[in-house]
Amino acid sequence: MEFIVEGDPQGKARPRFSQKSGTVYTPAKTAKYEKLIRKAFLAAGGKAIPSDCYVGITVDAYFQIPKSYTKGKRLACQHNINRPAKKPDIDNTLKVVLDALNKAAYEDDKQVVEVSCRKWYSRSAGYLRISVREVKQ
């Protein structure tokens, strides 16, 4: 199943440590983004893949072309000649998606055996296109 998450792609932030209690927690911005991804999956009619099955995930992160780019550079971005080599790092983008879909698209992210993650420029606002599928043995 494929679904879209509107808004600029974000990466998984490092866990934070509480000085007072000594506990580890996920930053609020990351937790909110994970919730947004999970809601988009469920709103698209997503159903969990059984725990005895393998999962494949494709994540395409689309970033808005900066307004400061020249006409030539914007055109190169539109034709995928220039790609967004910028933050967030691709591994952090993938990690936030995998964690968000835990217990929603699959029981545990250990079921994920195939991944693809790419960064592109978008002619409009930024978004994520995520595809989750069962991988046959």
Where does each model-flagged region fall?
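Acidic, proline/glycine-enriched N-terminal capping motif
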Residues: M1-Q137
